[in-house]
Amino acid sequence: MAAGSTGERPFFEIITSVRYWIIHAVALPAIFVAGFLFVSSGLAYDAFGTPRPDTYFQAGESKAPVVVQRFDSKAELDTRLK
């Protein structure tokens, strides 16, 4: 072992090994597919409590609602959502 070495394998040696690619050839695509299904199924919206893209605006609106009264904002939004 060289002076100052931590005893770990060099990164280049790891990524050029067959064992690394056998493991990661399955793991990396599986993570990608799982993430794609998590988002495309809508489960991500339910898990994090965010509104779905089609529920941001009412049917008749073409832009984001603007709250005019600062201290009555909840009442203003409640009347808009009725």
UniProtKB/Swiss-Prot annotation:
GO cellular component: photosystem II; plasma membrane-derived thylakoid membrane
Extent of the signal sequence: none
Compartments where located: Cellular thylakoid membrane
Membrane protein topology class: Single-pass membrane protein
Disulphides: none
Alphabetical list of InterPro entries matching this protein: PSII_cyt_b559_asu, PSII_cyt_b559_asu_sf, PSII_cyt_b559_N, PSII_cytb559_asu_lum
Cofactor(s) this protein requires: heme b
Any single Pfam family the record assigns to this protein: Cytochrom_B559a
Keywords for the protein's UniProt record, in alphabetical order: Electron transport, Heme, Iron, Membrane, Metal-binding, Photosynthesis, Photosystem II, Thylakoid, Transmembrane, Transmembrane helix, Transport
GO molecular function: electron transfer activity; heme binding; iron ion binding
Entries under SUPFAM superfamilies matching the protein: Cytochrome b559 subunits
Domain of life of the organism encoding this protein: Bacteria
Cofactor info, note text: With its partner (PsbF) binds heme. PSII binds additional chlorophylls, carotenoids and specific lipids.
BP-aspect Gene Ontology terms: photosynthetic electron transport chain
Binding site for heme: H24
Annotated transmembrane regions: 22-36
Assigned protein family: Belongs to the PsbE/PsbF family.
NCBIfam families the UniProt entry points to: cyt_b559_alpha (TIGR01332)
Function text: This b-type cytochrome is tightly associated with the reaction center of photosystem II (PSII). PSII is a light-driven water:plastoquinone oxidoreductase that uses light energy to abstract electrons from H(2)O, generating O(2) and a proton gradient subsequently used for ATP formation. It consists of a core antenna complex that captures photons, and an electron transfer chain that converts photonic excitation into a charge separation.
Quaternary structure and interacting proteins, as annotated: Heterodimer of an alpha subunit and a beta subunit. PSII is composed of 1 copy each of membrane proteins PsbA, PsbB, PsbC, PsbD, PsbE, PsbF, PsbH, PsbI, PsbJ, PsbK, PsbL, PsbM, PsbT, PsbX, PsbY, Psb30/Ycf12, peripheral proteins PsbO, CyanoQ (PsbQ), PsbU, PsbV and a large number of cofactors. It forms dimeric complexes.
Protein name: Cytochrome b559 subunit alpha
High-level lineage: Bacteria, Bacillati, Cyanobacteriota, Cyanophyceae, Synechococcales
